[in-house]
Amino acid sequence: MPIIGKLIRKTTALSFKRNAKKGIDYRHQLEALRATIERAKSTKFGFVYSFHAILTKTDVVSQYQKMVPIVDYDEFHEKWLKDSIAGAKDHTWKGRIKYYALSSGTTGSPSKRIPVTTEMIRSFQRVSLRQFSILHELNLPEEFYSASILAVGGSTKLTKKSTHVEGDLSGILKKHTPCPTPMA
């Protein structure tokens, strides 16, 4: 096991250096917004809120804020989400949304369904790896990297509905964990 600890420690060091060079600032957020609008412009939501036109503007953020209204969950659910949940394709996101995370929330509806797209799952996976790479900064001993880890999350029980699967976000993410996590 010591060799595994050494290998993982070295990997976190390399990942940390790469991520530190990238930096996370406004430019990256703007790129993410542009990419999201670009990806969703051919959806019904993108058509109604003129995503094609937003992308032609110099100030995408201001134009997006001007074109897309702020609404509460109940209004968004009624106008957009219920059709996606019913299986509508290209409605709020490209393709059909297969997963919905359940949230009790604090306002409005007693139970909320939050769309979880394939892109979102991949993003969670990338962020998890980046967080892991930050361990390098803690200068932990090699033994740490081969020790057992306790991960705490919500229920991994997912419920299959006619058009989608729903459950706790942690359960959806666990289903898409790229490598098995052995139980000690």
Regions found by a protein language model. Give the residues of each.
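Nucleotide 5′-phosphate-binding alpha/beta core
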Residues: M1-L102, G108-A184
